[in-house]
Amino acid sequence: PKYTIVDKETCIACGACGAAAPDIYDYDEDGIAYVTLDDNQGIVEVPDILIDDMMDAFEGCPTESIKVADEPFDGDPNKFD
């Protein structure tokens, strides 16, 4: 299983992740990205069909704000740093 979360402290609202994976990432009123699957808690497994899109977003994030892990983040984007 794969989980994802956005570090909203480092996100610069560039829009790259939503373009790469619109079924996973969206933006708040300030343009800051979040994971729509679980309101950016990193606790819902990303469906297999969306893994490639998620990895494209992860690799394309200029600030490394998108985090990906094999275990849930429990709301903490820095849990595995």
From Swiss-Prot:
InterPro entries from the entry? 3Fe4S_ferredoxin (IPR001080), 4Fe4S_Fe-S-bd (IPR017896), ET_Ferredoxin (IPR052395)
The prosthetic group or cofactor this protein requires is: [4Fe-4S] cluster
In the record, what terms sit under GO molecular function?
A: 4 iron, 4 sulfur cluster binding; electron transfer activity; iron ion binding
Q: Which Pfam families does the record associate with it? A: Fer4_13 (PF13370)
Residues annotated for [4Fe-4S] cluster binding in this entry: 11, 14, 17, 61
Q: Which UniProt keywords apply?
A: 4Fe-4S, Electron transport, Iron, Iron-sulfur, Metal-binding, Repeat, Transport
Signal sequence annotation: none
SUPFAM superfamilies named in the record: 4Fe-4S ferredoxins (SSF54862)
PROSITE patterns, alphabetically? Answer: 4FE4S_FER_2 (PS51379)
How is the cofactor bound here? Binds 1 [4Fe-4S] cluster.
Domain called 4Fe-4S ferredoxin-type: residue spans: 2-30
Looking up PANTHER family in the UniProt record yields:
FERREDOXIN
Q: What does this chain do?
A: Ferredoxins are iron-sulfur proteins that transfer electrons in a wide variety of metabolic reactions.
**The protein, known as:** Ferredoxin
Its source organism is Geobacillus stearothermophilus (Bacillus stearothermophilus)
Q: What is the lineage of its organism?
A: Bacteria, Bacillati, Bacillota, Bacilli, Bacillales
Q: Which gene encodes it?
A: fer
